[in-house]
């Protein structure tokens, strides 16, 4: 039987049923993520196209195009000070002209919400990951964080 890739509803909405998109949660770790390490994620609870892999904690672009990504979670660290997470594209930090780092300041107790989004132009086979920045911090997981992305066009 044929695969339906695009459906237009009676009121004009375009439904792209096979359009690449994913959402996953931060894998809970009761210890700190070391500086400059990749943030681990759980199996995706949305993974249309199967383009997110929890085996290597990355999204791989199935086609050339513009992709939007969003990341958020609660973060704590020992003592007060700044911390950041950052987007990686093909193994290198995607900052500067692309936007990049997600910063916050920790008071020394409790949790802070860290979030950010980015739009990247990707070629087929390019991959995107989220990394912890230059400080050892604890990324909360399970019910508290999410990494998601989708093909915009």
Which residues does each PLM region occupy?
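Short, small/polar residue-rich loop motifs at catalytic or cofactor-binding pockets
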Residues: 1-2
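Extracellular jelly-roll beta-sandwich "head" domains, especially the C-terminal globular C1q domain
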Residues: 5, 9-153
């Amino acid at each position: 039987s044929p695969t339906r890739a695009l459906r237009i509803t009676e009121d004009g909405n375009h439904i792209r049923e096979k359009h690449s998109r994913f959402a996953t949660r931060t894998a809970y770790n009761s210890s700190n993520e070391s500086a400059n390490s990749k943030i681990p994620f759980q199996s995706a609870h949305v993974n249309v196209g199967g383009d997110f892999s929890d085996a290597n904690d990355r999204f791989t672009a199935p086609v050339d195009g513009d992709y939007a990504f969003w990341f958020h979670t609660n973060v704590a660290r020992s003592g007060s000070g700044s911390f950041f997470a950052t987007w990686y594209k093909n193994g290198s930090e995607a900052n500067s002209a692309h936007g990049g780092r997600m910063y916050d300041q920790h008071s020394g107790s409790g949790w802070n919400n860290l979030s950010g989004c980015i739009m990247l132009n990707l070629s087929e086979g390019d991959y995107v990951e989220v990394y912890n920045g230059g400080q050892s911090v604890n990324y909360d997981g399970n019910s508290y964080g999410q990494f998601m992305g989708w093909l915009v066009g």
